Structures are given as structure tokens and as C-alpha cells.
Amino acid sequence: MSLTQSKEVNSLSRRYSTYIERRITRTVMVGDIAIGSDYPVRVQSMINEDTMDVDNSYLAIKRLHEVGCEIVRLTVPSLAHAKAVGDIKEKLIKNNIDTPLVADVHHNGMKIAMEVAKHVDKVRINPGLFVFEKSDPTRTEYTDTEFETIKKTILKRFTPLVEVLKSENKALRIGVNHGSLSERMLFTYGDTPLGMTESAMEFVKICDELDFHNIIISMKASRAPVMLAAYRMIADRLDAEGYNYPLHLGVTEAGDGDYGRIKSTAGIGTLLAEGLGDTIRVSLTEAPEKEIPVCYSILQSLGLRKTMVEYISCPSCGRTLFNLEEVVDKVRKATSHLTGLDIAIMGCIVNGPGEMADADYGYVGKGKGTIALYRRKEEIKRVPEDEGVDALIRLIKDDGKWIDP
């Protein structure tokens, strides 16, 4: 077999694999949370409160912590806000909440970033807003000299922050947004994934020059196709140039309700399935704590993390022998705390036993008024329908897998 044929076979084997092979990335510590391909994909969010409101900011972080959020971001638009973050951090420590904090800094926020770096575990900057570039409607080109001049300005302003982050072993997110590319990136590359990639790479290379590698990169857009293209492009570019930095995935401004969740899943889930992504945020126009179950559901659906019971149930049809929706609800209410189990509830024997073969336990209609309970592929017993849920619980208890809620 030739080298080319071997590569094609390997590519096909990955394409048809039932296991997601993650892109190899370095480990970046954000507080005590390790981000990178050697660790689970992490879940994070951002609070809505004004950071100056220390008490309510603390409570918002506490709510996120309680639902499993691993990293929390705060907006820091001024020096006063930066100092308030210190008070928030102190209150978290006093209450034994160790969730790492990320400061979101924009618009020439060098002094702000320097101040807040003392109090947080990671600073997020937006390359498009780091150095103000005044729009010139008469411009016909950006010369190499102009690019180099602006790069030197960025280097001068950026270096002190990098040195602080290095000295305190803290992290940086280079957070590119499709909607806020710099004037010269827009002029040169357009409002495109390529413009986003060039924007990110400019800062990646500056960090490399400064020997700073605690970097995470994001390429967010409000349209999933743009976001998908940008993340694929930056991953290819990083790998081609020998950089193995982790990626933070997200569809920004995804909206709310079902559509916001579906839109986020279309973007984030697609990239995760391709092996890209080391930490994720689902951005909803809702209370931040509502984002966290969506994140964990995406990860569990792809087999990347298991943090809840996996329920397998058919959509129901004319062959269904009991009220499937009602029974699924009863089983879920009784067993949702048994993290790690797979439980299948199937309406009839046509597809039931085969479809649920990988489940730990099965609940299948076997005739009018009769339920069959399974342990993996083995039928254990048949019981009257009205005793089915209780009998399932007894079976789980008999196997020593029950935990009181």
C-alpha cells in the first residue's frame, strides 16, 4: 500500500469511527481547571450582572456553580469594575466556591486588563477592539508598512499584560468575534472566516514571540456556518504552523428558546464531532444557569462526557402497548439522579430489544398490560404494566446500583 493510500484509509477509518478522536491540544490551566485534549471538554458561562454589584454578581456565580458550570466570565468595562472583581473573588473564597473567573476586556482596555489580571484566572481580549483604528472612507489599500506599524503598536500595548499573565501563571483567551473585526482586517480580508483567522493569528504570533503559551482561542459568530468555517480554518492554520492551543467553542448571540439551543448545538456539536473544541459555552438570551444543561446534553449526546442518565426511548407508533410519554416521565422522575446509567423505555418488541441492547436496563411492552424488564440483553421478568416502574426500581436496587436521591 502506498503512503497516499495509507493516508486515505486512515482518513476513512476516522470518518466512519464511532469514537470521536479529539484534536491534540496542550494543557492550559484556568485556576484549578485544566483545559486541553487530555481532559474533558469544559463547560462555562457568563453572568449578566453589572460587576460593580458585588453581592448579585456573587449570587449569579454561585447559581452557576451549583448547576455544574466550571468557569465563569464577567464583563470588566472600567478600572472600577476591575477592582470590584477582587471583592467578588474574595466573597467566593470565603464561601468555599472555587470556580475560576475570566475577565472580559474590550476597547483599548490595557489598564483594565492589568488591574483585573490580579483577581482572575484568565483574561479575554478581543483582537478587533484592542487597538483603535479609525475608519478612513478614502482608503484604497493597507500597505505592508501600515500593517507592521499597527503590529508594533499592538506589541507595545500587549506586552505588559502578557508579562503579568506569565508571572502569575494565568491564561489568556484570544477571543475573535465575527462582528468586531478591526478596520484593517475588514479592509484586507473582508468580513470573512479568513479575516477572523488572520486576526487571531496575529495575536498568537505575538504571544509566541513573547514566549507565552497559556492561550485559548475562540472564533465566534452569530451564524453557525460562519462559525464552523472560522474554527476549521484556525485549527488547520494552528496545526500547520506548529501551534497546539485549545479552542473555546460558541455561537455568539444564539437567541433563546428551542431555536437558540438548536442553533448552538448545530455549531458546537458539529465541531465537537469533528474533534475540535476543548471548552464550550452555549450563549442564550436567558438566565445563564439555563445554558449549562444544554452544554452537558451536547457533550453527553456525543459521548464526550457522561453527567446524567442516558434515556433511550422510541418515538411511539401504532404498535406501542402503553402510554410511552407518561411512562418515560415516570421513569425519569424516579431515576434521574442515577448518573451513569443507560435506561431504555421501548413501546413494543419489534425494535425494542435490539435498539436497547447497549442499555443497562430496559422496559419494554410485551403484550397488552404486560411489561418485560431487561438487564442489558437478558429478559429478567415480566410484570403487569401498573407495576412496571416500581419493578424497574427494585431491579436496579437488587443489582446494587441504586442511590437514594
Curated annotation (Swiss-Prot):
EC number(s) reported in the record: 1.17.7.1
* Any GO BP: isopentenyl diphosphate biosynthetic process, methylerythritol 4-phosphate pathway
Catalysed reaction equations from the record: (2E)-4-hydroxy-3-methylbut-2-enyl diphosphate + 2 oxidized [2Fe-2S]-[ferredoxin] + H2O = 2-C-methyl-D-erythritol 2,4-cyclic diphosphate + 2 reduced [2Fe-2S]-[ferredoxin] + H(+)
Q: Name one GO molecular function term.
A: 4-hydroxy-3-methylbut-2-en-1-yl diphosphate synthase activity (ferredoxin)
State the free-text cofactor note.
Answer: Binds 1 [4Fe-4S] cluster.
Keyword Ribonucleoprotein in annotation: no
Q: Where does [4Fe-4S] cluster bind?
A: C314, C317, C348, E355
Which SUPFAM superfamilies does this one have?
Answer: Nitrite and sulphite reductase 4Fe-4S domain-like (SSF56014)
Q: Does the entry feature the keyword Oxidoreductase, yes or no?
A: yes
Q: Which cofactor does it need?
A: [4Fe-4S] cluster
User: What keywords would UniProt list here?
Assistant: 4Fe-4S, Iron, Iron-sulfur, Isoprene biosynthesis, Metal-binding, Oxidoreductase
Task: Give, as in the UniProt entry, the pathway in which the protein acts.
Answer: Isoprenoid biosynthesis; isopentenyl diphosphate biosynthesis via DXP pathway; isopentenyl diphosphate from 1-deoxy-D-xylulose 5-phosphate: step 5/6
The EC category is oxidoreductase
Q: Which pairs of positions does the record mark as disulfide bonds?
A: none
Which family would the database say this protein is a member of?
Answer: Belongs to the IspG family.
Sum up the protein's function in the record's words.
Converts 2C-methyl-D-erythritol 2,4-cyclodiphosphate (ME-2,4cPP) into 1-hydroxy-2-methyl-2-(E)-butenyl 4-diphosphate.
Task: From the Swiss-Prot or TrEMBL record, give the protein name.
Answer: 4-hydroxy-3-methylbut-2-en-1-yl diphosphate synthase (ferredoxin)
Give the source species: Prochlorococcus marinus subsp. pastoris (strain CCMP1986 / NIES-2087 / MED4)
